[in-house]
Amino acid sequence: MPVRGDRGFPPRRELSGWLRAPGMEELIWEQYTVTLQKDSKRGFGIAVSGGRDNPHFENGETSIVISDVLPGGPADGLLQENDRVVMVNGTPMEDVLHSFAVQQLRKSGKVAAIVVKRPRKVQVAALQASPPLDQDDRAFEVMDEFDGRSFRSGYSERSRLNSHGGRSRSWEDSPERGRPHERARSRERDLSRDRSRGRSLERGLDQDHARTRDRSRGRSLERGLDHDFGPSRDRDRDRSRGRSIDQDYERAYHRAYDPDYERAYSPEYRRGARHDARSRGPRSRSREHPHSRSPSPEPRGRPGPIGVLLMKSRANEEYGLRLGSQIFVKEMTRTGLATKDGNLHEGDIILKINGTVTENMSLTDARKLIEKSRGKLQLVVLRDSQQTLINIPSLNDSDSEIEDISEIESNRSFSPEERRHQYSDYDYHSSSEKLKERPSSREDTPSRLSRMGATPTPFKSTGDIAGTVVPETNKEPRYQEDPPAPQPKAAPRTFLRPSPEDEAIYGPNTKMVRFKKGDSVGLRLAGGNDVGIFVAGIQEGTSAEQEGLQEGDQILKVNTQDFRGLVREDAVLYLLEIPKGEMVTILAQSRADVYRDILACGRGDSFFIRSHFECEKETPQSLAFTRGEVFRVVDTLYDGKLGNWLAVRIGNELEKGLIPNKSRAEQMASVQNAQRDNAGDRADFWRMRGQRSGVKKNLRKSREDLTAVVSVSTKFPAYERVLLREAGFKRPVVLFGPIADIAMEKLANELPDWFQTAKTEPKDAGSEKSTGVVRLNTVRQIIEQDKHALLDVTPKAVDLLNYTQWFPIVIFFNPDSRQGVKTMRQRLNPTSNKSSRKLFDQANKLKKTCAHLFTATINLNSANDSWFGSLKDTIQHQQGEAVWVSEGKMEGMDDDPEDRMSYLTAMGADYLSCDSRLISDFEDTDGEGGAYTDNELDEPAEEPLVSSITRSSEPVQHEESIRKPSPEPRAQMRRAASSDQLRDNSPPPAFKPEPPKAKTQNKEESYDFSKSYEYKSNPSAVAGNETPGASTKGYPPPVAAKPTFGRSILKPSTPIPPQEGEEVGESSEEQDNAPKSVLGKVKIFEKMDHKARLQRMQELQEAQNARIEIAQKHPDIYAVPIKTHKPDPGTPQHTSSRPPEPQKAPSRPYQDTRGSYGSDAEEEEYRQQLSEHSKRGYYGQSARYRDTEL
């Protein structure tokens, strides 16, 4: 590599002799290119981590790292863990997002060419002491690290290199480093990523890197030269406590790029400067105490620093440097134990602290080791007789107090410039803008997973990085580069007085500051809802710093937002949402002692959540979970970034990892709900298609196979804040499984003092069985009697019960086999004719989709009846257990904590509109379930198969099958009618059990029903349903058949087609909410139906005749009028399903028999048929009558 020849630099001082001991190891990087063949099952057999959006949590390295190699996979033997991925199929992987790297691997096809670099240590010969070099030498002495090992936090060389991202920052410039600046990241930023506190680095020294030098808190690194580094930036350098960049070496930058410095760096001037430096004696910590050092050997004369400039001639050239650092005794106080002991001297290199190797250890970690010493500090040091480290010219930490080594406050040792860089990666939070140079401060927390809750939130620098730097002059450069004394200490501040109301709430020692927000508020936040929000750092030069906010202040209120109990993520988001230029009023209290305790113990956020969606594992640090799991969140701003929460899974305290934050979780839950809805629509379509076929076998298969396993939708948010509380009432009991009906009856009969069945309101017109809706008031009355309410409801209704804080005990009977179900039911209920196969299949579907609703599971054994004893014990145990209740709703009970039911009834939901039968697709539509349910009427073997799908998508009308392939809106429409009736009879509920879109569907259905009279007036359709055998050949007819349409149309007792009645039936419900009897309901319905028929019968008959005439004249276009005219589409479908000729039948019965209808006996017979069809589920309009009861 060529050396820039026209600009020399003063020679660099040598390191101490121990660094040149023989047998040292040097780290080199070897580059490999491997070609992987994708396996059909294992893929490429590797796992990658890292990336710009997923940096290493210890040092912020953003390389793409091979985190795992699958044994026996395609990469086994070719790649190793912790290989750095340089290129994938010619695409550079430097400073890219993790998702981008994964995408490149996925789209590689079957072959992937991967270029990686791998670290390797080699033995190097001992370095010989070199004579002093003059200004023309172009040599840069290589510093090698002491080869120590550490058992703590992976500080050894091996653990640093083999950890994720590595504690060893190894950044050689490999081929991709020289790619053009059009890349997302240019060469001048190759070194700017690393701001770690004292990590071993293999860093390229590029000409554009001077302003990106290390900001670490305990190390200094010799960097390359930046030709853009002008006089205004010459103070932009390391401010660390333990290392600093050579000052003469820094001035060499200006000699190389500023002609004004030529004279200052002549040989004569350098010799004089060195003489002056030696004559001044040991440097002091500050100008006020120039000779406050403890006695130490005087530094010997040594050659001055030299400057070396390395320039690449090719993009793939490497600098070949490895930089290291070590903790040393920088200063000793006169009164400290170290000075009194006499065995320590300034400049001694500390090799171990209490047995822990300090190689590349940060000052923060060293301080914590010292704090844990408990009054006994054991050090292993190496004496540096030349005192190389303490005599390197550097800037002094004027803002750090001289104190005992055990009281080092490394968090306060930043110089002004370093603090500005330390917080500069807050640009992720405080602004959408990105700084051109973004130093990383991810080394603030050594144990991020255990202490992330107390990790401060960084913030963004608002101005130029070196904009406030005082230019250096030629005279006394060493001291004129020192920053001025901190201004906040100059004079006491007078804070604004908060209002009396705020003082009464927050206390008398509250201070108030008010300022106008700039680009950012300029605050780093620590803590969380468990301990409070604290100021962890203040950006210099911002209004917050000028107004007197200090580190350790607890923020109590910002503008109108109370920060007490606020999670750290919400606090950061609130500050970000304040518009630029708006006034910010902050109420704070100085609580430095509490703040120190928070940082020591790592506490921050702490709250519990319950998930209501499913999440797969995204990264190795992530947790996978399903619906209904509970977590304790300990940090809402993991790694100082928005997007992930650090959480602990309840029930497994050792399982800690990342979960999506609230906003991401809501997005994922909405996507899953949308997919679930789409799956339901497709299932409904295929169910309708199956219903149109007349084959019994296909219907059976359709019901079982096409009833897709769809998860129950929920009204809960993605994350529900929960608390663990005891239920102060007897919780309702819901049983699922093949013997649930038997178990409920057994509990109610044998233990009447403890259990009572909640009666359901009838939903079927003429039905003698209570299979409808359950009043919440009925449940409340049972609970007030200090009994468990036995509920026969759907899984969807269970979710609603949880939403309304009824906390039901949900027990699932898990069958062992289909034969076992049959054996048990025959033994427990010999008269039951339910299909064991259907019950077994239904139980399996429940177990797959609704397991998150179960609070307990009882495994059935057909050989005995021990399940009943287990059931009683389980209910008793569940009643005594604490319940995870919604935190928000629990807060609403503070006014009346004793009266549990006062809060439950305050929800306003006086009715639980849910079906008592479990439906095949687990939606709470009425009338569903068929033989699948546990408490439905037995199906005689000789009767036709009644599919639960039929009732799930009822009514099975041919016109409806054509017009609306999806029956779901009909079920929702009926539920909406029930809800409307509820709202008429009770106060508005706090929540609506059904989606609001049902209202619109209800209107649409009513409109469509009014247009379908002419189809339903077709007597041939009725004639086809008169014979009992018709139902065995195909699907049952949608309405009970009257013997004839021969009655006079003036009489009110007109046959009622089902879809006609839906619209009118609802009107009757609005007029009379409580008919006296089923017969009264029928009469009211017939009156409303008759009014509509009087107005439209003639018009419909004429249209029917015209349609038939057109069809006969133009048979080739027979289907055209049916498709274009909405009232007609049912006619061809209806006729196609009947053997008799359909087209000629409609007109004559209307014309011939309109004048005469049947007698009252026929009317009574019709009503009986109506009742029978309703019982059997054939009557498609039964839902309207059932909902009338509400």
Curated annotation (Swiss-Prot):
Residue stretches of biased makeup (Acidic residues): 1060-1072
Subcellular location: Cell junction, Adherens junction; Cell membrane; Cell junction, Tight junction; Nucleus
Phosphothreonine, modified sites: 455, 905, 925, 933, 1131
Gene3D superfamilies reported for this sequence: 2.30.42.10, P-loop containing nucleotide triphosphate hydrolases, SH3 Domains
Domain SH3: start-end pairs: 604-669
Basic and acidic residues bias: start-end ranges: 169-291, 415-446, 956-967, 994-1014, 1166-1175
InterPro entries to which the protein is assigned, alphabetical: GK/Ca_channel_bsu (IPR008145), Guanylate_kin-like_dom (IPR008144), P-loop_NTPase (IPR027417), PDZ (IPR001478), PDZ_sf (IPR036034), SH3-like_dom_sf (IPR036028), SH3_domain (IPR001452), ZO (IPR005417)
GO CC terms: adherens junction; bicellular tight junction; cell-cell contact zone; cytosol; nucleoplasm; nucleus; plasma membrane
GO MF annotations, alphabetized: cadherin binding; cell adhesion molecule binding; guanylate kinase activity; protein domain specific binding; protein tyrosine kinase binding; protein-macromolecule adaptor activity
Phosphoserine modified-residue sites: 16, 130, 150, 153, 163, 168, 170, 174, 200, 220, 232, 244, 266, 325, 398, 400, 406, 415, 424, 430-431, 499, 702, 902, 913, 920, 966, 978, 986, 1006, 1067-1068, 1147, 1159
Top-level division of the source organism's lineage: Eukaryota
Pfam families xref list: Guanylate_kin (PF00625), PDZ (PF00595), SH3_2 (PF07653)
Membrane topology of this protein: Peripheral membrane protein
Modified residues (Phosphotyrosine): 574, 1118
Domain Guanylate kinase-like stretches: 678-876
Positions of the PDZ domain: 33-120, 307-385, 509-590
Effect of residue 48 to A: In FHCA1; affects the interaction with claudins
Database matches in SUPFAM superfamilies: P-loop containing nucleoside triphosphate hydrolases, PDZ domain-like, SH3-domain
Tissue-specific expression: This protein is found in epithelial cell junctions. Isoform A1 is abundant in the heart and brain. Detected in brain and skeletal muscle. It is present almost exclusively in normal tissues. Isoform C1 is expressed at high level in the kidney, pancreas, heart and placenta. Not detected in brain and skeletal muscle. Found in normal as well as in most neoplastic tissues.
Subunit structure: Homodimer. Interacts (via PDZ2 domain) with TJP1/ZO1 (via PDZ2 domain). Interacts with OCLN. Interacts with UBN1. Interacts with SAFB in the nucleus. Interacts with SCRIB. Interacts with USP53 (via the C-terminal region). Interacts with claudins, including CLDN1, CLDN2, CLDN3, CLDN5 and CLDN7. Interacts with CLDN18. Interacts (via N-terminus) with CTNNA1.
Disease: Hypercholanemia, familial, 1: A disorder characterized by elevated serum bile acid concentrations, itching, and fat malabsorption.
Function in brief: Plays a role in tight junctions and adherens junctions. Acts as a positive regulator of RANKL-induced osteoclast differentiation, potentially via mediating downstream transcriptional activity.
Stated name of the protein: Tight junction protein 2
Lineage of the species this protein comes from: Eukaryota, Metazoa, Chordata, Craniata, Vertebrata
Gene: TJP2
